[in-house]
C-alpha cells in the first residue's frame, strides 16, 4: 500500500494512523483524507485511478461511491476509504512514515476524533482520545484544534459536555477484538478527562 501513487496527495488518518504511531490498539481499516488548500479547489476523489491501483494489490470485493468526494473499497478483506474533505487541514506537520505513506500527527487525529463526536458516539473514539491524553498531549491543545477544525460549529461548552458524558459510550465485544492496551471503562475515561481539565 505504501508504494501506491494514489495515496501521495492523501494522509492516513484515524485509528490506523494512531496505532502506527502509538500502538494503543489495533485498527481494521485504512482511512485516507485530503483537505482543501484554496477556496476554489474542487474537492473530488479520483476513484477510477485509485481503483486501478488497488486492483493490483488485491481483490476488490466491494466499491461504494458515497459522493464525488468520498469512496470506500473492500480489498481482500481490508476496508479502504478516500475522502476529499471540504475543510482546511488540521495537520500542520504530516508524519513521513514509509515510501509514499504519510500520517496525520497524533494531535490532529485527536482533534478529528473530537470533531467526529458531533456525528457518532463510538467507544473507540473515546478510547483514542484517552490514549492521546495519556501520551502527554494537553487536552486544551486538542480542544482548541478541534474547535478550529470544525469551523467553530463546535462550541467549547458542547465539546466538553460530550467528552465528560461517558454514558454515550459503551465498550463492546467488537472493541475488545482490537487488543486495546488500556483496560479502561467509559466512566474511567470520563474521570481522567475531568482530571485533565482541572
Pin down the residues of each PLM region.
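Compositionally biased terminal segments of proteins
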Residues: 1-198
